[in-house]
Amino acid sequence: MVAICDVDQQVLDREVQKCKNQGVQVAAYTDIRKLLEDRNVDVITIATPNHWHALAAIWAVQAGKDVYVEKPVSHNVWEGRKIVEAARSHQRIVQAGMQIRSSSGIAEAVQFLREGRLGKILRARGLCYKRRESIGKVGGPQPVPFSVDYDLWCGPAPKEPLMRKQLHYDWHWVWPTGNGDLGNQCIHQMDLARWMLGEPALSPRVLSIGGRFGYEDDGTTPNTIGVNKSPPMSPDRESESFWSES
């Protein structure tokens, strides 16, 4: 590791100190554009809020860096396609941060399945039940932590007043910056089902139903959702992923 970038100065100082405690000296940046000018950086890991993923990845490949970007790779489908275009144009590597894909045990199970040793698989179903606490409800704009450069935090997202109790992490549960647990957790179940089935392309038919139930809070993304899709070129097979956190 040669550098760390974070728009929260407190977080940045803390992580730099952790590196020092282990005998590692790193450069510290609050602006990713400055980080990408650093010639000592060959590869970057992007673990920002979702709304920053695409722009950070595209800037990185344009700067000649390879990229490991946390899931979801992008905030929406269009952004994801732009990342692919940029990576191909600049001949850089962009890897999606899906830790399940790096599990040797899971990879062996996928191979076992694809070899037909369980017969023809007609349906794959992924389930996750994980209760999350309400993020609360506020009556108006909240103060942004003093250590945060809010302009840089918002980046490509609209710069709007903070309308929830907590800036960090709870960005997952509002649409301008997050995707809810569809992109935070359900993506693992959907990806595993597609991997197991060996899907070569996007599904021609997808049905998703859900909503935000149980809480009256400042969250806007679903906390309960079901996704059903038919794998491409296989109308007789289907995969399903269901997420519930209520």
List each model region and its residues.
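N-terminal glycine-/serine-/threonine-rich beta1-alpha1-beta2 phosphate-ribose binding loop
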Residues: 1-69, 75-93
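Tryptophan-centric aromatic hotspots in well-structured domains and transmembrane helices
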Residues: 12, 50-52, 59, 68, ...
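A contiguous active-site-proximal alpha/beta segment in oxidoreductase catalytic domains
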Residues: 20, 66-68, 74-152
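Secondary-structure transition/capping motifs at alpha-helix termini
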Residues: 24, 64, 86-92, 115-119, ...
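Short beta-strand segments
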Residues: 45, 125-128, 207-210, 228, ...
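Glycine- and other small-residue-rich loops at beta-strand/loop junctions that grip anionic moieties
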Residues: 46, 72, 98, 182
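Rossmann-like dinucleotide-binding domain that binds NAD(P)(H)
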Residues: 151-237
